[in-house]
Amino acid sequence: MATVDRWLLPDGIEEVLPPEAARIEIARRQVLDLFQSWGYELVVTPHIEYLESLLTGAGQDLDQRTFKVVDPQSGRLMGFRADFTPQVARIDAHTLRREGPSRLCYAGSVLHAQPRALSTSRSPIQLGAELYGDASPTSDVEVISLMLATLQLTDVPDVHMDLGHVGIYRGLARAANLSGDVEQQLFDALQRKAVDEVQTLTADLPKDLGNMLRALVELCGGREVLAEARVRLGRAPASVLAALDDLLAIADRLASRYPDLPLYFDLGELRGYHYHTGVVFAVFVPGEGQSIAQGGRYDDIGADFGRARPATGFSTDLKTLVTLGRAEVVLPAGGIWMPDSSDAALWQHVCQLRNEGQRVVQALPGQPLSAALEADCDRQLIQQDGRWQVLPLTH
């Protein structure tokens, strides 16, 4: 390897330098404090574990995004976490085993073998919150509200939200008795809004079902979409109508809480179709091609761990929030330069200053006073009249 190559990082892997690292860490603490104020408890999960545990309940997308290695001790395949949710689901289902609802949150680095999109990070700092044990739209509204509070805390401007419900397509596909291949092809066509393909794939279905599946391409827009859906999907199975009712209840509550939040509905949006079971949502901002925060309902994700529970949650990338947010993160200003001395009184004074939250930097042997500027110090400790005092730094 050439010397120059030793400085290179893999595509999508980045290091964070001061002061940006301090901004990210301060924001992380603030967001976790926000989660705690809503009743969410922090969990810390392993960076790496056996692959079958890591991917349990997850879809194919997560499998493709997971780095895999062989454990030299057991010979078993392991993976680096690419998403916290399967791990948190295991904690809820297998470890905590609470009877009532559980509110859990997390913050930490994840690693992606494949990026979410072109030029996106493969090592985001994922943070999120999850609510287990309640199947009502009230829980969905809670996690969406917490997501919006997180964006408000970091002052991300001009957000708008997309809402959908995978239960609508799933209920129609079941009623049509589609084969697995056709269901997947139709799913792909709906995501691309490929009208001609959708028409071809539904041509042989009963008239009502074909019309309703084709309608999903067009059922996107503002709140009026929900009223239109009640008409165009009026002959749908009961599960589809129940999904529409849930979506309407969530939309009503959000409109009441956030009257200025633009809401966009897309009933053909099937983000996380193989993973989510109900409402899905995502937040976008101008200039960003990908959602900056997303989530939805994923009931029974803990079934493979022996306990099926309703679940809903959201996640986002802390690095992205800090980059896009306008919130002023106040970094500790300046510092105090401590001379290289063995004086016990000086040490006691420095300990007191640090306990008070002051930043004190120790001078190393041979360092001139000018080094204090490089250490971002604006004051110094000087002994006067037999006492150590903090005075302005003299150049």
Curated annotation (Swiss-Prot):
Give coiled-coil spans as residue ranges.
none
Family to which this protein belongs: Belongs to the class-II aminoacyl-tRNA synthetase family. HisZ subfamily.
Its predominant location is cytoplasm
What's this chain's function? Required for the first step of histidine biosynthesis. May allow the feedback regulation of ATP phosphoribosyltransferase activity by histidine.
What keywords were assigned to this record?
Amino-acid biosynthesis, Cytoplasm, Histidine biosynthesis
Q: Which compartments does it reside in?
A: Cytoplasm
PANTHER family with a match to the protein in the record? HISTIDINE--TRNA LIGASE, HISTIDYL-TRNA SYNTHETASE
Q: Give the matching CDD domains.
A: HisRS-like_core
Q: What else is known?
A: This function is generally fulfilled by the C-terminal part of HisG, which is missing in some bacteria such as this one.
Name one process (GO BP) from the record.
L-histidine biosynthetic process
Oligomer status and interactors:
Heteromultimer composed of HisG and HisZ subunits.
Which cellular component terms (GO) are annotated to the entry?
cytoplasm
User: Corresponding gene?
Assistant: hisZ
- Designated name of the protein: ATP phosphoribosyltransferase regulatory subunit
What SUPFAM superfamilies does the record tag this protein with? Class II aaRS and biotin synthetases
- Top-level division of the source organism's lineage: Bacteria
Gene3D superfamilies referenced in this protein's UniProt entry, alphabetically: Bira Bifunctional Protein, Domain 2
- Annotated pathway: Amino-acid biosynthesis; L-histidine biosynthesis; L-histidine from 5-phospho-alpha-D-ribose 1-diphosphate: step 1/9
What is the native source organism of this protein? Pseudomonas entomophila (strain L48)
